Amino acid sequence: MKLHNRVTVKTDGGPRREGTILAVEEFSEGVMYLVSLDDYPTGIWFFNELSSPDGIFVEPVVGETQAK
């Protein structure tokens, strides 16, 4: 996933929320995404772990073509 891609994020106790990627930082354990949400337009950081499917919080919006 790249800058400006539309994504959904997993948050505690609710449905997945749609947002837009504002920044991407790669680490050895996974990838951090700064995602703009409707109620947090300046963004919130979410971490996707490489080693665990339960640690995936950011996913591409289904059915949208992602920018390259």
Curated annotation (Swiss-Prot):
Signal peptide interval: none
Transmembrane segments: none
One Pfam family linked to the record: DSRB
Family annotation (HAMAP family): DsrB
UniProt similarity note: Belongs to the DsrB family.
Name listed for the protein in its UniProt record: Protein DsrB
Organism: Sodalis glossinidius (strain morsitans)
Gene name per UniProt: dsrB
